[in-house]
């Protein structure tokens, strides 16, 4: 195994994004490449000019909260009042639903970070003669909602170059298109702090586009004029922010609102106009996050006890496991067992589940093999939500295990080391070289080294 020097490390790391054609915001792909975006912007223009009611429907995770924040901030900065609804996980379920539509009487509805699976809700809106614009980034299923426009890079006939972008990025591009249509004077780079937060929280791969947005966004957060980020910076007390600060500290705080209570708490925090309201919201988020950790530990232990090491996947369930926690537990067990994990909470005979897997497994395709058993499902390649009758859980588990057995050779990631590292060269300059090419995430993984003849003095679990 080759020895790694400071010079060699810097050379390897910088080569990863040496020829990035999108290293500047001015050179990123145009919003015009999205299917339906011109139809959508003209409809929004019509609504603005006629004073028509506009309702934004978001989602309760960080990406959905940030997507909603961007839309509200964008319209508010123009002096245009819009309504918004962020579904409560426990009252409404996920995204645009019939329950949500029951609360909308007229106007134009715009979804952010959801909507691509909302077929029944779209029918209800059509019955009410309410136009629907869907902005989403989740996988497109067979049953496409009825909408005036669908802005989603994962549509087969969408020409946008990058398919793996988060919901907030789609919403941001939509706002940029509206700005262009209406000739508004708004600096779209002012949203990079929010975009950075959403991209990392939603575990998007560090493609050339995402890398540029997050890299610039991390700097933007550090110098942000938003009261929320100013307060978070004062708590973190760091000169340089890295992706782990977002992924393991900031994002979990914000996610705790939608997981444990109501996502509007996190939304209000991001939209805070003064230090006092930001402080008040953050105090609630800290309390919810602390409660989340307690519940998470209990469910993780119970799920661990139910798992079978011989199975190809972790598929476990129990009555009344907290719905807001099972996604984190699935992620934790997927990492520790190095296999896909499906965690279900059963209430009144219905099993609602969250699934997580590493980058080699396509969960959406995997779950599709058992689609005949499901009441509904949706998500990404590596994260998904699903529901089915409790009585169908054993058969679902059997199908999942059989399907994964066919793909056993790609079941888990292996660590690939860059080389052997002498402990003596791990000094501030060396660490600075690693930090200098932040952010790290999928498709731009953190460097792994082999270290010989060293003793572990201290370890710490984060997140």
What label would you give each PLM region?
Residues 91, 112, 329-335, 449-453, ...:
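Short, solvent-exposed secondary-structure boundary motifs
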Residues 2-108, 128, 146, 179-398, ...:
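Hydrophobic helix-and-loop "lid/oligomerization" segment in the mid-to-C-terminal part
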Residues 203, 223-227, 403-463:
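A contiguous loop/helix-start segment that scaffolds small-molecule binding in enzyme catalytic cores
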Residues 137-146, 260, 367-372, 395-406, ...:
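A short, terminal or domain-edge coil/loop segment
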Residues 135-140, 303-306, 403-408, 457-459:
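Intrinsically disordered, low-complexity boundary segments flanking structured domains
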Residues 101-102, 109-204:
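Conserved phosphate-handling catalytic cores of large alpha/beta enzymes
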Residues 112-124, 382, 390-391, 395-400, ...:
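Phosphate/diphosphate-binding loops
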């Amino acid at each position: 195994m080759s020895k790694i020097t400071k010079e060699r490390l810097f050379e390897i790391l910088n080569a990863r994004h040496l020829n990035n054609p999108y290293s500047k915001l001015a050179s990123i792909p145009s919003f015009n490449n999205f299917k339906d975006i011109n139809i959508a912007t003209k409809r929004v223009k019509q609504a603005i000019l006629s004073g028509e009611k506009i309702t934004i429907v978001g989602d309760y995770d960080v990406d959905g909260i940030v997507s909603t924040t961007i839309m509200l901030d964008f319209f508010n900065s123009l002096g245009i009042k819009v309504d918004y609804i962020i579904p409560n996980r426990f009252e409404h379920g996920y995204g645009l639903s019939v329950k949500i539509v029951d609360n909308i009487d007229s106007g134009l509805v715009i979804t952010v970070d959801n909507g691509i699976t909302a077929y029944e809700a779209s029918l209800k809106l059509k019955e009410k003669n309410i136009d629907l614009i869907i902005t989403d980034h989740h996988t497109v299923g067979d049953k496409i909602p009825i909408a005036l426009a669908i802005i989603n890079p994962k549509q087969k006939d969408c020409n946008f170059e990058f398919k793996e972008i988060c919901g907030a990025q789609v919403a941001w591009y939509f706002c940029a298109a509206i700005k262009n249509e209406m000739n508004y004077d708004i600096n779209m780079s002012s949203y990079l702090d929010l975009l950075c937060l959403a991209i990392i929280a939603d575990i998007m791969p560090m493609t050339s586009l995402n890398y540029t947005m997050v890299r610039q966004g991390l700097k933007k957060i550090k110098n942000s004029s938003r009261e929320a980020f100013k307060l978070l910076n004062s708590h973190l007390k760091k000169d340089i922010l890295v992706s782990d600060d977002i992924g393991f500290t900031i994002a979990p705080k914000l996610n705790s609102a939608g997981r444990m209570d109501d996502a509007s708490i996190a939304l209000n925090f991001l939209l805070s106009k003064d230090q006092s309201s930001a402080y008040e919201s953050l105090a609630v988020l800290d309390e919810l996050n602390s409660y989340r950790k307690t519940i998470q530990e209990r469910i993780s232990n119970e799920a661990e006890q139910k798992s079978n090491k011989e199975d190809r996947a972790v598929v476990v369930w129990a009555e009344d496991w907290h719905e807001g926690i099972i996604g984190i537990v699935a992620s934790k067990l997927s990492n520790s067992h190095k296999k896909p994990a499906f965690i279900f909470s059963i209430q009144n005979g219905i099993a609602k589940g969250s699934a997580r897997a590493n980058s080699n497994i396509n969960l959406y395709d995997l779950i599709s093999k058992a689609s005949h058993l499901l009441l509904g499902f949706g998500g990404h390649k590596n994260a998904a939500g699903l529901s089915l009758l409790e009585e169908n859980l054993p058969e679902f588990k059997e199908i999942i295990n059989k399907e994964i057995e066919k793909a056993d050779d790609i079941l888990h990631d292996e660590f690939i080391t860059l080389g052997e590292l002498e402990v003596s060269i791990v000094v501030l300059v060396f660490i600075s070289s690693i930090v200098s090419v932040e952010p790290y995430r999928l498709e731009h993984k953190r460097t792994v080294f082999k270290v010989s003849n060293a003793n572990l003095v201290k370890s710490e679990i984060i997140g």
